[in-house]
């Protein structure tokens, strides 16, 4: 009999029911279930230790970098390699001596953090196809198509922004930026005139700058072609490059990298014609009158004929009238006249400026010396005190002499003989202790009368007395024993008022009489028997008291040019000085000295 299919109900064969799961109320408590079920057929299936972040993030970062680098190399092979040389220079391949192959030095660069690589990629040149057209850009001034493509990306990605701007400037204006300007390397150097080339200026800001700059400038020249805008600004006050950049960046809302700035060429006729001709066109905006450096080179006038020839006599006349005797003063002051004086402009353009300055100084000294010799002492004093400006009081000198216990009447009598160079009375000695005001008193007199000072330190030279032949009055300050010995030995005839032979440099000895000679010393020569032969030749006055000072450390007695001017005017008659109206012939007025070749009645 075949076995029946299915299960059987016999109890002896139903052991599987014993293995069934037991029901419990805790069947949903998974945490308790897992805690109780510790028996497992798989060992160490679960790790109950603390979790740690491995290096999976670093691995992911490396994989991303490798993928980015691979994509970048593919793009560089596709776009940059065929145009690397063309972007550097279109003519580089034709003049290259190396094989015609592209440089791939940086094409397969080593792996890096990615920062430097990204910066290098941004610095690469971009092909002309990658251009962003400007929206509402300005129309081309001369025959343009109207719409202009402004290559913003080429400027941002260029490794040499200045070279890129200069190339775009030359492309727009047809002339190099350096052909119109001279270079200032320092940012702190000030200049009144500046040439600015600004890239990618917004139209509204471009138009507003024409009005805003008028308050800062005397002359404005503005023109925009394409993306480039050219400014010529003549500021009212000198500005350095940093100040100009700060002004333009705030006014035009541009970055400093978008600006080229240099001062213009002032002596270049071609550059001046560029500004002059450009300002006459309709595309340029100008405000104000032409600056002098443009007008002088482009505008013809009667000044051009005068400036072409240098008149040496006019330079000598100018130096004589202004009392310039030294070469540095003549050169500097005459150069300052160049903007107004056409003869000074011609002198600056001459290649023998130093020669003319030396000859001018020599001629002025000759004229001044001849004029001095022709004048009497009265006329000389009158001329010099008239040159003093301001007013003083003669009582300061009188009070100082009385403070030093000097009899003013005696001093006035000796001073009168001193000024007239009376024989054996033409030398006055002021002696006394130190800090008594001897040198201050003597120097103030020499200063107002434009006298000369002798220094015994030069006594080793045989020409140390030469200033005595070139002055109306002289001073020998701080005479010591060696100097007294020299005077007692060699200068007795000069103090007597006789002619002496004076050795002068670069000429034969000349015959002169000593001018009035003023001495200061700490030694009373009248109390020294060794110098008894000088007692009758020198009139001495003692200053025994220290020079008085105010609490603010200023002199109590004002020994100034104004005080001496008042002194001579007040005591002119007592000093027996002649009336100036009687100096001329029959009261006729004397006209000013003229040493120029121009006639007196010539038209100005």
Swiss-Prot record:
Region feature Disordered, mapped onto this chain: 579-604
Domain SF3 helicase: 406-556
Keyword Hydrolase recorded: yes
Keywords recorded for this protein, A-Z: ATP-binding, DNA replication, DNA-binding, Early protein, Helicase, Host nucleus, Hydrolase, Isomerase, Isopeptide bond, Nucleotide-binding, Phosphoprotein, Ubl conjugation
GO BP annotations, alphabetical order: DNA replication
Motif (Nuclear export signal): 88-97
Catalytic activity, as annotated: Couples ATP hydrolysis with the unwinding of duplex DNA by translocating in the 3'-5' direction; ATP + H2O = ADP + phosphate + H(+)
Covalent cross-link Glycyl lysine isopeptide (Lys-Gly) (interchain with G-Cter in SUMO) as placed by the record, residue numbers: 513
EC number assigned by the record: 5.6.2.4
Subcellular localization(s) per the UniProt record: Host nucleus
Motif Nuclear localization signal location, chain numbering: 76-78
PTM-bearing positions, type Phosphoserine: 81, 89
One cellular component term from this protein's GO annotations in UniProt: host cell nucleus
InterPro entries, A to Z: Helicase_SF3_DNA-vir, P-loop_NTPase, PPV_DNA_helicase_E1_C, PPV_DNA_helicase_E1_N, PPV_E1_DBD, PPV_E1_DBD_sf, Rep_E1_papillomaV, Znf_lg_T-Ag_D1_dom_sf
GO function term, MF aspect, one: DNA helicase activity
Binding site for ATP: 432-439
Segments for region (DNA-binding region): 144-307
EC category: isomerase
Biased composition (Polar residues): 591-604
Reported modifications of this chain: Phosphorylated.
HAMAP family: PPV_E1
Subunit description: Can form hexamers. Interacts with E2 protein; this interaction increases E1 DNA binding specificity. Interacts with host DNA polymerase subunit POLA2. Interacts with host single stranded DNA-binding protein RPA1. Interacts with host TOP1; this interaction stimulates the enzymatic activity of TOP1.
Task of the protein: ATP-dependent DNA 3'-5' helicase required for initiation of viral DNA replication. It forms a complex with the viral E2 protein. The E1-E2 complex binds to the replication origin which contains binding sites for both proteins. During the initial step, a dimer of E1 interacts with a dimer of protein E2 leading to a complex that binds the viral origin of replication with high specificity. Then, a second dimer of E1 displaces the E2 dimer in an ATP-dependent manner to form the E1 tetramer.
UniProt similarity note: Belongs to the papillomaviridae E1 protein family.
Protein name per its UniProtKB record: Replication protein E1
Organism: Human papillomavirus 12
Lineage of origin: Viruses, Monodnaviria, Shotokuvirae, Cossaviricota, Papovaviricetes
Gene: E1
């Amino acid at each position: 009999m075949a076995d029946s299919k299915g299960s059987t109900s016999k109890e002896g064969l139903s052991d599987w029911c014993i293995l069934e799961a037991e029901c419990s109320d805790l069947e949903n408590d998974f945490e308790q279930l897992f805690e109780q079920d510790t028996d497992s057929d798989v060992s160490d299936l679960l790790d109950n230790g603390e979790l740690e972040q491995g290096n999976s993030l670093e691995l992911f970062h490396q994989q991303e970098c490798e993928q980015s680098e691979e994509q970048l190399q593919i793009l560089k092979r596709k776009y940059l390699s065929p145009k690397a040389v063309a972007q550097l220079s279109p003519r580089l391949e034709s003049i290259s001596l190396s094989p015609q192959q592209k440089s791939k030095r940086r094409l397969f660069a080593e792996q890096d953090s990615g920062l430097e690589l990204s910066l290098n990629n941004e610095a690469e040149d971009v092909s002309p196809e990658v251009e962003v057209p400007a929206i509402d850009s300005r129309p081309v001034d001369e025959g343009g198509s109207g719409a202009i493509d402004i290559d913003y990306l080429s400027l941002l990605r260029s490794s040499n922004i200045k070279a890129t701007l200069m190339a775009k400037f030359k492309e727009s204006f047809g002339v190099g930026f350096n052909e119109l300007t001279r270079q200032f390397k320092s940012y702190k150097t000030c200049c009144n005139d500046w040439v600015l080339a600004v890239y990618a200026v917004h139209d509204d800001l471009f138009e507003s700058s024409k009005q805003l700059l008028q308050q800062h400038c005397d002359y404005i020249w503005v023109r925009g072609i394409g993306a480039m805008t050219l400014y010529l600004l003549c500021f009212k006050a000198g500005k350095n490059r940093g100040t100009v950049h700060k002004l333009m960046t705030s006014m035009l809302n541009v970055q400093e990298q978008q600006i080229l700035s240099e001062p213009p060429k002032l002596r270049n006729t071609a550059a001046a014609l560029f500004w002059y001709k450009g300002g006459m066109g309709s595309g340029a905006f100008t405000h104000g009158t032409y600056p002098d450096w443009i007008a002088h080179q482009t505008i013809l006038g009667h000044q051009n004929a005068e400036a072409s020839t240098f008149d040496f006599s006019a330079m000598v006349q100018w130096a004589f009238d202004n009392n310039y005797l030294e070469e540095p003063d003549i050169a500097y002051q005459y150069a300052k006249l160049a903007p107004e004086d056409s003869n000074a402009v011609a002198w600056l353009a001459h290649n023998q400026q130093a020669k003319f300055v030396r000859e001018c100084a020599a001629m002025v000294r000759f004229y001044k010396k001849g004029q001095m010799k022709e004048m009497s002492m009265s006329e000389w004093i009158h001329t010099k005190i008239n040159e003093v400006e301001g007013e003083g009081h003669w009582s300061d000198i009188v009070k100082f002499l009385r403070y030093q216990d000097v009899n003013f009447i005696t001093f006035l009598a000796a001073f009168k003989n001193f000024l007239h160079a009376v024989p054996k009375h033409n030398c006055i000695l002021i002696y006394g202790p130190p800090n008594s005001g001897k040198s201050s008193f003597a120097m103030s007199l020499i200063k107002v009368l434009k006298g000369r000072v002798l220094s015994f330190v030069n006594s080793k030279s045989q020409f140390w007395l030469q200033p005595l032949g070139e002055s109306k009055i002289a001073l020998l300050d701080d005479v010591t024993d060696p100097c007294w010995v020299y005077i007692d030995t060699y200068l007795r005839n000069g103090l007597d008022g006789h002619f002496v032979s004076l050795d002068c440099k670069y000429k034969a000895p000349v015959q002169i009489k000593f001018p009035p000679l003023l001495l200061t010393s700490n030694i009373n020569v009248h109390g020294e028997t060794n110098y008894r032969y000088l007692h009758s030749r020198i009139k001495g006055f003692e200053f025994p008291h220290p020079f008085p000072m105010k609490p603010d450390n200023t002199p109590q007695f004002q020994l100034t040019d104004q005080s001496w001017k008042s002194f001579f005017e007040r005591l002119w008659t007592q000093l027996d000085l002649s009336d100036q109206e009687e100096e001329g012939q029959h009261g006729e007025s004397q006209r000013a000295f003229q040493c120029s070749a121009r006639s007196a009645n010539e038209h100005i």
